[in-house]
């Protein structure tokens, strides 16, 4: 990563992963297998952030970030579109006079369930504020596991053009840049 201005104008970069080797994660309450589906890099503006401390997915993914890119990340569009999150979903509302339509908003924003690869990344995620520019790098993953004797499954989206249940990115983050600070 260079330290020029973070370019939020481009679409996320998604590539085939060179390895599907599983990533194993053990927690106090469960154990999980992450299966890499794609390498992923997302540069954008944080439009909403929600933290979780309850349930199996909070144990492994304590933070969701709603991130916008393209024209949607430009400050002049903030007055037209508002974002919020709850219960692992993100929501947006836009004013009728918005120059960006519903399709543009869908195709240029995403709700990312963040699985931090390291404690350092976990700590950095806690500092992120709304309106900050970030670059996240890592893997989109599917998850299977056991939590308190019950089976759990969580599958990532592999497109930015879907909506509704299952349209979020399950993002195993291995590197994050917040403004000029990089964490691994």
Enumerate the predicted regions with their spans.
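OB-fold and OB-like single-stranded nucleic-acid-recognition modules
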Residues: 1-184
């Amino acid at each position: 990563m260079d330290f020029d201005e973070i370019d939020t104008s481009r679409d996320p970069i998604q590539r085939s992963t060179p390895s599907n080797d599983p990533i194993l994660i053990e927690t106090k309450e469960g154990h999980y297998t992450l299966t890499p589906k794609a390498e992923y890099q997302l540069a954008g503006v944080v439009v909403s952030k929600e933290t979780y401390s309850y349930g199996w997915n909070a144990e492994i993914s304590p933070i969701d970030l709603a991130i916008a890119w393209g024209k949607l990340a430009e400050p002049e569009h903030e007055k037209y579109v508002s974002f919020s999150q709850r219960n692992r979903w993100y929501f947006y509302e836009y004013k009728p006079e918005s120059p960006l339509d519903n399709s543009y908003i869908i195709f240029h924003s995403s709700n990312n369930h963040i699985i931090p690869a390291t404690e350092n990344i976990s700590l950095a995620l806690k500092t992120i504020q709304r309106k900050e520019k970030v670059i996240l790098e890592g893997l989109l993953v599917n998850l299977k596991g056991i939590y308190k004797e019950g089976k759990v499954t969580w599958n990532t989206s592999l497109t930015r053009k879907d909506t509704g249940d299952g349209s979020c990115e399950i993002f195993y983050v291995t590197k994050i840049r917040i403004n000029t600070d990089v964490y691994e």
